[in-house]
Amino acid sequence: VKPFIDREYRTIPDAAHTGLGGASLGGIMAMHLGLRYPKTFGKLAVMSPSVWWDRGVILRSVKSLTAKTAQRIWLDVGTEEGRGMAENAKRLRDALTEKGWALDSDLYYFEDKRAGHEDSAWAMRSHKVLRFLFPATKVRG
């Protein structure tokens, strides 16, 4: 899909300008694909990730990394998502920091107070995700 998008639309195709994101199981898929293709996806939005999926395979994937990648990662969770979601998101955050990602630098962890596991909650914080992953830059002129 990415070659098609880069061919058909005006993009900056390098990893520094390419992001991938998702929520829930989509968040896990974004993290999985991002870790597998770090030279393609330099920015990852991992919202309310279903860390429990496949017996925590994403935690094992992060822990098995031989080196930290040069990716910028947004990780978040709502405190009212239930089923241990917040605790699992913290486990993923901790696994990433153990591999070298630095909180508030190339990894941002956000707990949305009173937010549930739903589209409306993700929509309400999506602007924060985009501001972190794609910060404003000065235009020379």
Residue spans for each PLM region:
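Non-catalytic cap/lid and distal C-terminal segments of serine-dependent acyl enzymes
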Residues: K2-G141
